[in-house]
Amino acid sequence: MKRKKKIHTGVCITDERIVCVTAHVENKTMVITDALEMKRSAPIDEDIRKFIEMYDLDDGAYSIVANIDTQMHVAPYDPHDFDMKEFIKWNVEDYFSFDGDCFQMDACRREYPRHNYHMFMVAVERHSLELLKQGIRDTYAPVDVIDFWPIPICYSLMRRSGTVTGVVEKGNLHLWLWWNDICIQECRIPITSTDVSEGIEQLETRLQEFGVDEIQGIKLYGLEQLTEEERKDMEAIISIYGETEYIPLLFLGRGRNRCNQGQLDWDMAIGMAARGLKWIGLGW
């Protein structure tokens, strides 16, 4: 009996639109067979409800990421004398700038080197997250995961340890340094050749603390917003470190015609589909 293919839909929500891709894995390749986008016109709970009703799944489930205010921090800890609630209680004000209880937290643990432990913490603005969850509940849609911005970008890439991702934001370049799917450093720097080069060198020094000698690749978004000179400077920096490649992908049908690979939200949706298919950490 032929085993049925697992199908999953990754969704990315920004302030401008919602995009999604539907995919399955075949011959060690993620095959994207459908894609859809919808312009935002209402609060996130109303828009996600409208989107899910418009894009009713025949099979599979959703995994979702939304551009909600998110802060991340990684800190060492001693597992032999450790209580998660106490750790957060006494350190949260040092790690995050949210006021009071207006955020929701999640955390995971990593080890490097042996017997040296790190706690990766994510804080997300609570109100928008609760609106998103309410919109999902209203549809009774099958949702496996709600992930945190911009972590899913890593899931669409071949290298997720030692990769730097960046987004042009209001005249600055926002950079994230990734190790084992967690962000170990982020920074915002002016978009000049000197500043970005120095910033990446500092990220590389931080990366070496986690056993990776050099940057493994760079992926930048929003370069079309820059002047020609700025863009050429950024492209020159990418050429030094190399551009991080995608996981093996094949686009068919509406997936080929509609999905704009290389745009941040589409790549996020691809990453969420990969996570939903558990097509991460399989040697890529």
Summary of predicted features, one role per range:
Residues 45-54, 148, 159-160:
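Phosphate-interacting basic helix/loop segments used at nucleotide- and nucleic-acid interfaces
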Residues 68-119:
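Internal amphipathic helical hairpin motif
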Residues 215-243:
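Glycine-rich phosphate-binding loops at beta-strand->alpha-helix junctions
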Residues 56-70, 212-226:
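Short glycine-rich phosphate-binding loop at a beta-alpha junction
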Residues 27-52, 191-193:
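Nucleic-acid-processing active sites and adjacent nucleic-acid-binding tracks
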Residues 245-284:
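Glycine-rich phosphate-binding/hydrolytic loop that grips phosphoryl groups
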Residues 44-49, 85-88, 196-205:
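Well-ordered, non-membrane alpha-helical segments in soluble/globular domains
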Residues 2-3, 7-22, 31-37, 58, ...:
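Small-residue (GG/TT-enriched) beta-loop-alpha framework at ligand/catalytic clefts
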